[in-house]
Each structure stands twice: as structure tokens, then as C-alpha cells.
Amino acid sequence: KVLFDFHSAAIDTDIIQDEDGMYHVFFKTEGGRKKGYRQYITKDLHNFASWGLLPYNCEDTHKAVEGAGVFQLIDGDWVMMYDCYIDGHYQFCTSKDLITFKRKQDTATKGMFTPRHGTVITITKKELKRLEKAFPNTK
């Protein structure tokens, strides 16, 4: 079943639920002249009539982007990361409200750091210790 129909090409959707139970549906527009990340906000993912579309793009750049991932930091701030694939870097933007994102850092995608459409998960200290034991740092 189709989750939503933007009435033109849309790819790379990421759905986040905030502390108030609101869903933030980030997606990249591929149709039309102005491509970029847009956002719907809703309380009910299964009632498209209740979705509200923000009137602007979310990314803090005019460069071509794709593969966004949104995650929350331990301090409560949010990060949107995406691939500036033509320019050869990943861009990280931060937000306190999941509405306004400001560029924090560009990281060159070269050498060992060449992510494409990645994601971030939170792990506990116990999980970190298990991972470090299973995959020791040999350098």
C-alpha cells in the first residue's frame, strides 16, 4: 500500500516520531525544477488527509542532495544528514524543533568515509562494550 502520493516523484523517505507523538515524514522531491527535502507533519500516519506539508525545503544548502537520515542526539537536539553527492561530501544539520535545520558541518566523502543513504542508531553502553569486544580496534 502506498503511504503517500506527492503527485510527482518522491524518494528516500525517513519517518521520525517526536516526544509529542507527532510524525515527521521527510522525503526528497524528484519531480519539478526545485528538488530537495520536504516534510509532512501528522499525528496519524494512516490518515493522509491529516498530514500538513511544510512550504519549504528542509536542507540548509542549495546543492543537490539525497539519502537523508534524521536522528536525535542524547542532548535532545536533532540531526539531519544527507549526501551532497555531486559535491563529494556529507552535510550534517542540527535542529531543536525538527522544523528549522542549520548547517553544522560538511564531511568529505573520501577514503574510508564514503557513506550512501546511511542511518544512525542509539546504542547503550553495554551494547558498546559488546561491540568493542567483538570488533577490537587494532590500529
Model-predicted regions and their roles:
Residues 1-139:
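Carbohydrate-active catalytic/glycan-binding domains of CAZyme proteins
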